[in-house]
Amino acid sequence: VEPDVVPDVVVVGSANMDLVLPVQRIPRPGETVLAGLMTRGPGGKGANQAVASARAGARTAMVVALGDDEGGALLRDALEGVDLSLATTADAPTGTAIITVEESGENSIVVAPGANRELTLSADALATIGQAKIVLSQLEIPFSTVQAAAAASAYFILNAAPAAELSDELLAEVDLLVVNETEAEAIAGPDRSALLKKVPAAVVTLGGAGAVILTRDAEEIAVPGVRVEVVDTTAAGDTFCGVLAATLAATSANDSITASDLTNAVRRANVAASLSVQAAGAIPSVPHGDAIDARYAEVYL
């Protein structure tokens, strides 16, 4: 990271090459289906979220492990606008995700983590994490690395995806949890308000229905979704997380993110996600700040 430029947002996360297979429907166990034309492109929850944060206007750095291979080189190019001075090259191959996408836009994904399994935090990475306004992680990297990033952060957002059971020790370091309904249930069971026993604030995303904000000092706040024609849901959740982080970094002092700050940020993130599902692919579908702001004005102002 440039010595004088402290990033607003540091993403500690995964980067994958996505192999996308368009199918009429996702195969059931024991079933073989034929796909259309396979495409490959850059993705991974961390990379998608870092690009979303940068495009939304935040100075963004990424701590990531890439392979010394074609996929790693393509990802470095794809992470436009993201500071990669803390990226490391691992002995393992770059992570790969195999994504089947139905005509409806529904998808299923299998990830081979590769280099992402080897992501650890250097002293430089920890120092930068400690200075950033917002640090954002997901669960496609080792939990020990997530825990170390959380412990070093001023304000730590965990997108607990893919769904997993998390230790209370890790959750104790989380300032804001972002989960979908499946992930929320994995952590706190069917009653989502139980999340607040584990974290001080949470955003539960509801797909096209928007999101709800849970905080300990306010009633549950529902933020309705933005109705759009869905082309491809890949990276919608990642766009949401990256734009949420970027917006919180721009609107709040570190120590006092309020329910109204969260509401504003979730609205902007909702708008960004609604734009991303109208385009195909992961990183290619992530919107830029001017498009987000124009649509935000139409929807909310």
Task: Show the residue positions of the predicted features.
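Conserved phosphate-binding/catalytic region of the ribokinase-like
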Residues: 1-8, 165, 192-301
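Conserved N-terminal subdomain of the carbohydrate kinase-like
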Residues: 17, 29-33, 37-40, 52-134, ...
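Positively charged, low-complexity intrinsically disordered leader regions
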Residues: 1-27
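Alpha-helical segments flanking ligand/cofactor-binding loops in enzyme cores
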Residues: 51, 76-77, 147, 151, ...
